[in-house]
């Protein structure tokens, strides 16, 4: 391991155009999970794959669903407008009341459904994966939430500013923003911040970069460890000088374009599949959650300081094709033993993951901004993959 290096990660706010689309897609997934039980539909039978495009005063929603027929386009439109309103868009080029919404949802392909729903030989009551693919999970003990420091603090900066904006304390700030944090590492441990970037939309046209810095700097300092900012830290606040036109009016958004922001900020591999808009039969989402869950519990158990875990699946096949663990030289037991322990401690079939993490619930809109990982599990079942309740099972399996 290098003695000294810099590593950078970025985050974006819930008002970033791509995150607006992630939020809308996940709100629709949640809608189907809320309405399904009301119509007598087993949550295990709900399916949703929803993609969103947002641009100037226009939202287009396309994809495949299976669920209650009681979910109408009017109901979906209402959910979309409520999401945009909650994010805070009331500007001329993108307003929750007046933007045009086009809905192009249709039933899930029968060819895909037969692979997911069909019983597999020798695997009674098991459902196959919704697609092939590889998924990664990662954990490190360099922050309390067992996340890499650069992405952890990049998220925290924007989350604090967003809370201030929503509370009404910072009325001149708009919904769209980005952050980037360059962290200095010594002997593999984060010790300070070399560079800070914050680009934040403002609602007053002639607000200067200096004035925006006066607004956001206290939140940046609150987010970071006290001694990490020094006189040598370089600040870049609205470096282009002006950020008045923001959101989908300034830059078109799409679901699934912020997969590194959603995960580990580039500190770990990514299998390439996005999360938002997908029900948990899609292993792009559910298996990535499971991989994080197992990796986090390995680190929480003290079995490694860092852990990368890869899972692989084939469409229509229930069992994972492979489980791979790399502890980056920090493991307390051989990685081959950890791989066996992971398989014993948790059922990593799609059904096993959905059951263990209780994923057949309307818990997805809350994941659509500020990362799917490093979050606090809530009372409604959200972020269940962040629990550390697998520690004892892993230890017993070794």
UniProtKB/Swiss-Prot annotation:
The UniProt record lists the keyword Cytoplasm? yes
The pathway where this protein functions is: Amino-acid biosynthesis; S-adenosyl-L-methionine biosynthesis; S-adenosyl-L-methionine from L-methionine: step 1/1
Q: What class of enzyme is it?
A: transferase
Q: Name one GO biological process term.
A: S-adenosylmethionine biosynthetic process
Q: Which GO terms describe its molecular function?
A: ATP binding; magnesium ion binding; methionine adenosyltransferase activity
Spell out the HAMAP family in the cross-references. S_AdoMet_synth1 (MF_00086)
What does the sequence similarity comment in the record state about its family? Answer: Belongs to the AdoMet synthase family.
| Entry-linked PANTHER family | S-ADENOSYLMETHIONINE SYNTHETASE
What's the name of the protein? S-adenosylmethionine synthase
Source species taxonomy: Bacteria, Pseudomonadati, Pseudomonadota, Alphaproteobacteria, Hyphomicrobiales
